[in-house]
Amino acid sequence: MSNPTIEGDENRKENTKSNTKPNFDDLDDLDDILDDLDVPSAFKNEEKKNIDEHKQTGNTSKENERIKNDDNLNSLIQEMMSKFEDLGGPSGLDGSQLSSSFQNDQLLNVILEDQFATEKDSDNGAVNYGALEAALNSLMSQVTSKEILYEPLKDLEANYPKFLKNAKETEKQGFEEQYQKIQKCIQIFESPEYDARKDADIISKLVEEIQEKPLPAPLIDNSMETAGCPTQ
């Protein structure tokens, strides 16, 4: 005759076993425990596969981050190269020549060495994009600086009114808008608050807008070309 008390205790033990779930803090612990447990090999292999995939995913994430950093770096440099190609460089250097020279690794390393953002973050090896962008913007501010652009723009401003007086009515509006942008550049350069770095973006934008329409042929005296501003 069975003892109800013993059977009840056994049932409670079985229920306790079936309801108890292991709480593993680490996937490596789970991996070790699976090796010790007597479970079907198919299940064990599947769990091992999941653990390995998890570990590989971590490594893949780091690799993807590195690739993303490299892509961002290339995009940033390419964007700055495009700006240089649009604006041209100092001393009459053609814009396309300047941008292509950026693709020379040796020159690029010289430009970016020391504080110019080739340094890596000590923790994750990521490119310091803030420092890199600051370095490239510094170069941009030199190309669009008062020392390079002010005199040729003043020459254009001085001769523009006479040209507009004799210009065809169909062409006047476009040239007047161009003239206003030239004046705006000069106003920025002559302002007591002018700052080459701070104002580089607006000067760059204005010069690009000026170049959207070819400069009047009678006003071209090579001064803009000498400053590195293509006249189209």
Swiss-Prot record:
InterPro entries documented for this protein: Pex19, Pex19_C_sf
Superkingdom in the source lineage: Eukaryota
Comp. bias intervals (Acidic residues): 25-38
Native source species: Schizosaccharomyces pombe (strain 972 / ATCC 24843) (Fission yeast)
Pfam families: Pex19
Ranges annotated as spanning the membrane: none
Protein name, as recorded: Uncharacterized protein C17C9.14
Single GO BP term: protein import into peroxisome membrane
One GO cellular component term noted in the UniProt record for this chain: cytosol
PANTHER family per record: PEROXISOMAL BIOGENESIS FACTOR 19 (PTHR12774:SF2)
Molecular function GO labels: peroxisome membrane targeting sequence binding
Residue stretches of biased makeup (Basic and acidic residues): 44-71
Residue ranges, annotated region (Disordered): 1-71
